[in-house]
Regions:
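Domain-level signal for soluble alpha/beta catalytic cores
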Residues: 1-149
Length: 149
């Protein structure tokens, strides 16, 4: 059994991040691309610094209260439809997702706390508030494959 599985099945509280996009939107003057949102911020110094500050805050809080923490990659919209709508090349799907995972590994190393688990965040292919637009299972698996790999 993995450390993650043991942790979440232990009944012990686990801190998670939350509202990353909302925090960037309301706490900073940083402009986010409306299609890929925080996924593209790692390509820019100011965006990267803000994301590091936000994620580090969750790690710091977990350390302060001796809790495990799960932080999710800023990749909710780093998927085919949103990458296309942003006018980015399809190769950026893999690049942005790998970059985000590496970024959070760095945050974890700098945080001086264990355990810090990293979750790969995969969002919907369309509007998350319109469940009728959800893809059938097989089509969803194919659509999300480039992001998951």
């Amino acid at each position: 059994m993995s450390d993650f599985t043991e942790t979440v099945t232990s009944g012990r509280p686990v801190l998670t991040d939350g509202g990353i996009e909302t925090r960037v939107m309301f706490e900073t003057p940083i402009h986010m691309d409306p299609d890929v949102q925080v996924a593209a911020l790692l390509d820019h110094r100011d965006g990267r610094m803000k994301l590091e500050s936000v994620y580090s805050g969750y790690v710091d809080a977990a350390r302060e209260f001796s809790l495990p923490v799960l932080i999710g990659t800023p990749t909710f919209r780093a998927s085919p439809n949103f990458i296309r709508r942003a006018g980015m090349p399809e190769e950026d799907i893999g690049r942005l997702n790998r970059q985000a995972a590496g970024f959070l590994k760095d945050v974890r190393e700098k945080g001086g706390h264990e355990p810090v688990f990293i979750g790969g965040v995969i969002g919907p292919s369309g509007d998350a508030y319109l469940p009728g637009q959800a893809l059938p299972v097989a089509q969803a698996a194919e659509y999300h494959r480039p992001q998951a790999e």
